[in-house]
Amino acid sequence: SGSCTTKTCWTTLPKFREIGYILKEKYSEAVHVEAVRATRLRQPTFLKIKKPRTYRKPMVTDLVYIERSPNYCEEDSSTGSVGTQGRLCNRTSHHGDGCDLMCCGRGYNTHQYTKVWQCNCKF
């Protein structure tokens, strides 16, 4: 009897969380640029870095932005941001739901609640 071995290879996407970490890092290192019109005819508009000359030129994989992001901590009806004031947060979390991050350094109030409900338990 003969034996047969096959090898199958395929490409998979990285885990969603890994992509999120990479995007977050790129977002925090994004470069502020401004659009500048070329002075000569038939030359395209180009982007100029709005940092000191010591700053390196962005690579093709870097993120750049033209306008600064709004302050999502404060309510802003023009952007539709409701802000973070009054939202529930997790005091012990170091993620997006954590009080230190969500409350934007403004501090927060803690409340302790006791909830009583009928559980239909049998002993």
Swiss-Prot record:
It is found in: Secreted, Extracellular space, Extracellular matrix; Secreted. Keywords: Developmental protein, Disulfide bond, Extracellular matrix, Glycoprotein, Lipoprotein, Secreted, Wnt signaling pathway. GO terms for cellular component: extracellular space. Palmitoleoylation is required for efficient binding to frizzled receptors. Depalmitoleoylation leads to Wnt signaling pathway inhibition. A lipid is attached at residue 1 (O-palmitoleoyl serine). GO terms for biological process: canonical Wnt signaling pathway; cell fate commitment; neuron differentiation; positive regulation of JNK cascade. The keyword Membrane does not apply. GO terms for molecular function: cytokine activity; frizzled binding. The keyword Disulfide bond applies. Pfam families: wnt (PF00110). Glycans are attached at residue 90. This is Protein Wnt-7b. It comes from Alopias vulpinus (Common thresher shark).
